[in-house]
Swiss-Prot record:
Further comment: Lysozyme C is capable of both hydrolysis and transglycosylation; it also shows a slight esterase activity. It acts rapidly on both peptide-substituted and unsubstituted peptidoglycan, and slowly on chitin oligosaccharides.
Enzyme Commission no: 3.2.1.17
Residue ranges occupied by any C-type lysozyme domain in the UniProt entry: 19-147
Upper taxonomic lineage: Eukaryota, Metazoa, Chordata, Craniata, Vertebrata
Catalytic activity: Hydrolysis of (1->4)-beta-linkages between N-acetylmuramic acid and N-acetyl-D-glucosamine residues in a peptidoglycan and between N-acetyl-D-glucosamine residues in chitodextrins
Protein name: Lysozyme C-3
One example GO MF annotation: lysozyme activity
Tissue specificity field: Expressed in stomach.
InterPro entries (alphabetical): Glyco_hydro_22, Glyco_hydro_22_CS, Glyco_hydro_22_lys, Lysozyme-like_dom_sf
Family statement drawn from the similarity comment of this UniProt entry: Belongs to the glycosyl hydrolase 22 family.
Segment forming the signal sequence: 1-18
Principal location class: secreted
Subcellular location per the Swiss-Prot or TrEMBL entry: Secreted
Bridged cysteine pairs (disulfide): 24-145, 48-133, 83-99, 95-113
Length: 147
């Protein structure tokens, strides 16, 4: 019985933590989902953005008290403009997706929303990209990934 309780707690902690991608695993996944050079944004830039936004963690969240909104998932997509979390005042839901869907281990919906965002606003919509990736050599993010 004690072993079942411990096993249950282990599974619960994995479910709450979500998937933290390895760098090259994420590179292959993003490439497969069509982000490599999407709207002129290189795969290395998407990896840099993901690293600085979420640490490659699908369950990452960040509350923004000023706008009463939350950033969700591997790309930290904001509930004020892009997804519906049911609690952000005057939310737009530009991607027509629930914010919880952006935190799934299968990142297909997060990628679809990221494509929508970059199509409308460009990669500069992400503050972390502007701060950590824009003027840097990001080639190391895909180095050795055998793409």
């Amino acid at each position: 019985m004690k072993a079942l309780v411990i096993l249950g707690l282990l599974f619960l902690s994995v479910a709450v933590q979500g998937k933290v991608f390895e760098r090259c695993e994420l590179a292959r996944t993003l490439k497969k989902l069509g982000l490599d050079d999407y709207k002129g944004v290189s795969l290395a830039n998407w990896l840099c953005l993901s690293k600085w936004e979420s640490g490659y963690n699908t369950k990452a969240t960040n509350y923004n008290p000023g706008s009463e909104s939350t950033d969700y998932g591997i790309f930290q997509i904001n509930s004020k403009w892009w997804c519906n979390d049911g609690k952000t005042p005057n939310a737009v839901d530009g991607c027509h997706v629930s914010c919880s869907a952006l935190m799934e281990n299968d990142i297909e919906k997060a990628v679809a929303c990221a494509k929508h965002i970059v199509s409308e606003q460009g990669i500069t919509a992400w503050v972390a990209w502007k701060s950590h990736c824009r003027v840097h050599d990001v080639s190391s993010y895909v180095e050795g990934c055998k793409l």
